Amino acid sequence: MKKLLGIVVLGLLLSGNAYPIENWEIKKVIDNKYIEISTEGLNVKGDKYKLLMKLNGKCDTIEDGFTFYTTKNNPGVMLLPGKKIKIESMGKTFASEIKAVVPVLSGSHHLVWITNGLYEFEGHTNFISQSEKNNVKLHFVFDDFEKGTGWEAKEFFNETENSWSLDNFSEAVKLGQKMCLEN
């Protein structure tokens, strides 16, 4: 009986589109067109470090990014998609792009999706797997990237720093790529 119960529970766990590897979730997203490999933030649980792979047969490119949840109700936050943001991540400072802003809780809070860009799968995942954590700090949101004008990140984000554990990263991305190749 215990064996049957174990098989049923295992079947239920594996029957959906999400597969867990300790501290990682792998699932199909965006109309089942992408595989998302994500983990929750250590400081703010609503923030996620995300890697996306398009289900295009090759599965050799990965988009690296994260979401930051903000309770600052700055009315300009909805104008941020497409803007560059200066961040510090993996020991480097660079400009990323704000890809989307989604209002939550009747619009008083927002989830901001920031992309670091597209990378070749193997090289990028090898680079990331060399670290134990991804510590991210948001510095500056550019209104005009060329002129260097804009706002301090704290104008839009109540929390400008978060960290993500990279424990089991290699296993998670391998499973994500396997799922991608099987579709």
Give, region by region, the residue ranges found by the protein language model:
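Sec-dependent N-terminal signal peptides
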Residues: 4-16
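A generic "folded-domain core" signal
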Residues: 19-129, 133-183
